[in-house]
Amino acid sequence: ELLNGYLMHKDSVVSRIENDIILNDNYRLPLMLKKGADITPWICSRAVDRHRTNSRLLKKVIRLTDTSDASTVLKAHAATVTDNYWIKFDGENIEYKNILLNDDSLADVALFGTFESISNAKYIHCEYSKSPELTNIGSFEKCWRLRNNKWYMYKKESPQERFSEIFIYKLGTFFGYDMAQYEQDGDCVVTEDFTLSKKYDFESAASIVGDDEDYTLNYKKLYEI
């Protein structure tokens, strides 16, 4: 089914969407998008990695009948923890506050494949999800947890991977770079949402260069911005 509605940034319309196509050119468009672009790849880029074992379990828990990337993301109105974009469907009378992700009751399912946190769930079987796990991208088993009204990402890793994340954070800090802070918690690393509760919109380098790891190309593309 083709998508008709609006690409939103908070409560502002960024672009009209008709039959999956972005109709308006706007400086607020995500870097992946431009006028005339098909919005489907952008939507799918926000999906939880389908190859993660716990992501498949997560979809079963919330009874997703269509487990495609696009359908999974749209179950949460394409909202994420790290930016303010979302999709408003034609016929909906809702505001940004109505789709904000504020439920971490699926955290244990997403991170460990266990169900301890589900007893507190409020939105598991609602038409639209308030959980951030459907749009928690990346290949590691991970989850978002709320602590003092702030989101923290927990990522399950091997000892070597945990060392690498924490070492790079401390090395960058030593040289004066503004780094995302990582700390160890058992067999996980933990980092606070570095967008400062969506004060900033996070755009990954993949939005600019895709999966190309050529340093020269990456530098040129970033310089052009």
Where are each of the predicted segments found?
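Phosphate/dinucleotide-binding and metal-coordinating scaffold of catalytic cores
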Residues: 1-225
